[in-house]
């Protein structure tokens, strides 16, 4: 019986999250209210507050899940594999991101003091680059930080480009035509 309850909870939370993402595509975050989420998701107020304290908590919850998965992909990407082994991993990250482009692009539009997914992803890319590429210690720390910044910017710009072109094969085209040796 408890498994049914868990399934209902999952369905309810997914309904709330999906409704929130739909609303982000229709209006700015500041104009979304809990009431608009309730109306569109067809749930009552107590159900919403059972899981989230407000729309900020909802957004942060979704973002934390995304960052956790993104971090996992980055750990795999930096796992010490050879260049030929990396290309399928990198393509997988781009493809998975493309599958989630509606969610990511909606959440990228939020930029508050506490919610800024695009910047968080870029910072995570920089941090992972620095952590994994710092062995052995870089000869020039300033240039090392610059490379980390360029790497993060390149990945985020590539993701945005893939989303904007709305072509499911774009990641393959990029992987085939880009020389990753400079930063990868």
Model-predicted segments: where are they?
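Cytosolic nucleotide-binding catalytic cores of signal-transduction proteins
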Residues: 3, 24-27, 139-143, 158-160, ...
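C-terminal peripheral helix-coil segments that are non-catalytic and often amphipathic
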Residues: 131, 152-153, 157-184
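Amphipathic alpha-helical packing segments from all-alpha helical-bundle domains
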Residues: 111-137, 142-149
């Amino acid at each position: 019986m408890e498994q049914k309850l868990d399934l209902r909870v999952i369905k309810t939370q997914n309904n709330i999250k999906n409704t929130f993402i739909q609303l982000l595509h229709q209006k700015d975050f500041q104009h979304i209210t809990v009431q608009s989420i309730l109306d569109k998701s067809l749930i009552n107020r107590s159900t919403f507050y059972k899981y989230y304290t407000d729309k900020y908590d909802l957004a942060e919850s979704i973002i934390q899940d995304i960052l956790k998965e993104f971090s996992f992909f980055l750990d795999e990407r930096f796992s010490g594999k050879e260049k030929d082994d990396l290309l399928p991993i990198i393509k997988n990250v781009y493809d998975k991101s493309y599958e989630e482009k509606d969610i990511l692009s909606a959440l990228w539009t939020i930029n508050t003091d506490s919610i800024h997914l695009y910047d968080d992803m870029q910072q995570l890319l920089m941090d992972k680059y620095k952590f994994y590429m710092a062995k052995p210690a870089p000869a020039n720390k300033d240039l090392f930080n610059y490379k980390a910044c360029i790497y993060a910017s390149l990945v985020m710009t590539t993701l945005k480009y893939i989303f904007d072109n709305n072509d499911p094969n774009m990641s393959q085209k990029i992987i085939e035509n880009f020389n990753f040796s400079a930063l990868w």
